[in-house]
Amino acid sequence: MGIFNGLPVPSDKTYLREELARIDESWAAARFDSLPHVVHILTSKDREADIHILKEQSDVVEEVVDEVVHAYHGGFNKAIQNYSQILRLFSESTEKIGDLKHDLAEAKQSLGARNKQLHQLWYRSVTLRHIISLLDQIEGIAKVPSRIEKLIADKQFYAAIQVYLQSSLMLEREGLQTVGALQDVRSELTKLRGALFFKILDDLHAHLYNRGEYSSVASSIYERDDEVPTTTAVAASRMSSQPLSRRTRTLKGDSQFGVRGLTNGSYRTASNDESSSFDGHDEEDSVEHDESTADTARNGTDSKLLSHQLPPWLSDSTPDEFIEAVRKSDDPLHVKYLQTLVQCLCMLGKVAAAGAIICQKLRPTIHEIIISKIKAHLETTNLSKSACSQGDRSVAAGLHLIKGQSEAYRLSKEKPQNGISNSGTHLAVSPVSPLMAPGGKAQAAAKELLDSILDTIVKIFENHVVIGELLEMKASQHDINTPRSLPTDVNWNTESEASQATGGYTISFPLTVLQSECQQLICEILRATPEAASADAAAQTAKLAKKAPKKDKRDAPEDGLTFTFRFTDATVSISNQGADLIRQGWGKRAPNASLEGYGSAAVLPEQGIYLAASIYRPVLQFTDKITSMLPKKHSQLVNDGLLTFTENFVKDHLLPTMFVDYRKGVQQAISSAAAFRPRAHTTTYTATVEKGRPILQGLLAIDLLAKEVLGWAQAMPKFATDLVKYVQTFLERTFERCRTSYMEAVLEKLSYMLIGRHDIEKLMRLDAASACLPSTLGHAVSHSEAVGTEVELSDLFLSLRPIKQDNLIRDDNKLILLASLSDSLEYVADSIERLGQAVPRVASQAEGNSRNQAASPRNLASFADEYRKLATDCLKVLRVEMQLETVFHLQEMTNREYLEDEDAEEPDDFVISLTSQITRREEGMAPFISGEKRNYVFGGISGIAANASIKALADMRSINLFGVQQICRNTIAVEQAMAAIPYIDGETVQQNLDRVRTYFELLNMPFEALLAFIAEHDQMFTPTEYSNLLKVNVPGRDTPSDAQSRLLEILSH
């Protein structure tokens, strides 16, 4: 049976377990029923056997019970003893309770008899406890001033204000108001309130301008040793600490203290592409940056707090709702500190006074910061100059100039091998010095300086936005100028504007002052007088004056921002409380705000209006950053700010000045006597200007000026359209001047008239030699077509005989000018084409589009085509001129007799004249055009010389053997002159002149031998040329009367 499994059966009686297992479990049931067993025995056939079985089972159970009793005998005895002892203890407790009841009854009777005396003693003890509590409070209050001073010294301002407010409340309690000894404490607390206010205000002022211990920058702006005046350092600083996010507006679930911006996720930084628009901005590379990683302490150590860690300046404060909100906030460290300082001012009821003093100190502080930045920049520059004996000549200007422009400005500083100084050309025609040119040191220095200053201003304005939003929110919640739980005599008008509650301090005021100071600095850099630059501000003021006033000024967003200069600064409305504090001396520590000038001239190599190009991009980036920081309701504040002033200044002052200056430079460049005077000090052509490519000085100057103007366009993309139009105007004027020089050289000359003929122009375009021309159309021409074209051109030129000398360009200087003009025009065309591909594309061209829709302005590519076409015309004139010169000299072969008496030792005089002219002109043109172009100019001589010599036979009356030798000697002289020209196709020249010698040597053959040669080489010469061989009179040769008919018969087969 399973119920007996746990019984203590000895190991020598294991059979008991087996016997127990045979017993039915029904015998061990809790509600045992014996009736079924009795009925079973009574009805059994063998009752004795069943009874015997039951007895055996009963014996087994008895034996098991004996074993159990034997095993648990000691335990049973101990349980009986314990039970007996428990009964005894209960009995004793009953007796003692009875005695206690008796004693209590007696005590009750005794106390009832002394009730009055007990009441008196209780009242006395309560009074004494209250007196002791008051004494403790008085003792504690007496220590409050020293405690507050200690907290102030430790910069635990929030804890100090908590102690101050708590102590003030205690002093107003009924029991302490009449204590005379506390009057001194009250007086000390009143003084400490003022001292605490000024300490908080000093610290707030320091952190507003990033001079405090918890500022957002790694070091103070006055720690000059850490400043690196490079564009890279400025960019890195901007990336590490620049906020680009719009602030959240209110705290979810407004708390009693009105904590602003303490929810998780506030003050987050947006990506850079929300705040960059240079080049189509940039500047151009956006990186997501977490502002919380940039908060570093002034000593350079990492001051970023761990999440939900209590800031150190609140370590001694009593926990409350504000502290809990700060602890849970994910805002940067400096933002939390600014929130704490504003909360302290609200608890003191000094917001209006603080706002008034901050407004009073804002302009002189910004002025001082800008001056200190300039001085630090100057000192760092001087240190870097002294450290390097020779500074790097390349300046990281930040002006990413268009492709190819760096080459032009490098040329302006180098002297090429031809002895012509491009720097001198640049200085002679450019209205600006190399320092002031795009990419110059002055431009780079101005951009670097302004980048550094505006970056500092942006960081300062970030703090002002934080403070301004906090004050605006708190002003909308409760009276921020009444100390919390502290009676005051100040009675503020609930209908007053929010700016009056903050002492005139709003987000618009620091933005106005900051941009005004920056504008004044820019005017100093540009040397712009206030009269020249304040017209825009006056127009803005008039525009705002026309606007209808808002009925509800508290809720309406500010519609615009107007500022001019320091002397037209906005008026600050200072409350009485703030004015009193200023008179008390806090404002006296500020430097004189009326100081003019920043000392930027000591840093910049040069100042002037052209620095507006390097200023434009930093101002554009500054405006983007400011816009991204402003809350939505203040987004209109930047519409009439610094960027508008800069753009208006560029549009109204810089662009007109630039156009007049560069137009004058262009005029000087193309009108000077040396502008179109070919000059070269090398005998061979070089392909680069640095190595001596002799570009005409006028065109080289125009190219430099065009690149310079487009450099300004790259620096100011918004005005690229106007600047490109300037370049087009200059190029058009220069092209007209080039065409005038070209016409002066070719006017009324036969070569100029011939290239203008449609048939000749078409044939020249199909000529294989034209493949090297800049404006070739690239038509594929077969060899047979090329030969046919050359022959046809030659026939046309020969048909012009006799050619007069007046129809030719006899002045070699004019031909050299055409060669130099062609190369220079091609150089400028290539440069214009590169510039046209890199000109910045302006997204919108608001001005002039409506007028130019019908006829869109020409682009730079069309000017490049015009320049290249004129360069091609120059080369065509030179080629045709040399061919006409050849025809002019060789036309003396006609109508004469070549009956010489002796062997020819020298060529004819006209051939000597031709070859010397070829040599002289080739040497004159060699420095000005490439070898390929020289091959084009002189390559047509051999072909037309060969054709002219062969055709001259038809007009000869007679010729003998020595005459043939004279003509062969002439061809050898021409061949030698042509072979002396580098890059000339000598094989073609030899083939052409060999053909002449072969042709004339046929005259030495007998008639029958000549017919046999013609029969074998009928395609070598034309039938007319073969016929001329028979027509000419050759002394000693027998020619039958039917010679022509026999020739025709041979050629007809």
From Swiss-Prot:
Q: Which domain of life is it from?
A: Eukaryota
The segment annotated Disordered runs over 255-308
Q: What happens when the gene is disrupted?
A: Male gametophytic lethal due to defect in pollen germination and pollen tube growth.
Q: Which family does it belong to?
A: Belongs to the SEC8 family.
Per the record, the coiled-coil ranges are: 91-121
Coarse class of the primary localization is cytoplasm
* Annotated protein name in UniProt: Exocyst complex component SEC8
Keywords noted in UniProt? Cell wall, Coiled coil, Cytoplasm, Cytoskeleton, Exocytosis, Secreted, Transport
Instruction: Describe the subunit structure.
Output: The exocyst complex is composed of SEC3, SEC5, SEC6, SEC8, SEC10, EXO70A1 and EXO84B.
List the GO cellular component terms: cytoskeleton; cytosol; exocyst; extracellular exosome; phragmoplast; plasma membrane; plasmodesma
Cross-referenced PANTHER family = EXOCYST COMPLEX COMPONENT 4 (PTHR14146:SF0)
Where does the record say this protein resides? Cytoplasm, Cytosol; Cytoplasm, Cytoskeleton, Phragmoplast; Secreted, Cell wall; Secreted, Extracellular exosome
Biased segments, Polar residues type: 263-278, 294-306
Q: What does this protein do, in the record's words?
A: Component of the exocyst complex involved in the docking of exocytic vesicles with fusion sites on the plasma membrane during regulated or polarized secretion. Involved in polarized cell growth and organ morphogenesis. During cytokinesis, involved in secretory processes during cell plate initiation, cell plate maturation and formation of new primary cell wall. Participates in polarized pectin delivery required for the polarized development of the mucilage-producing volcano cells of the seed coat.
Q: Could you state one GO biological process linked to this protein?
A: vesicle tethering involved in exocytosis
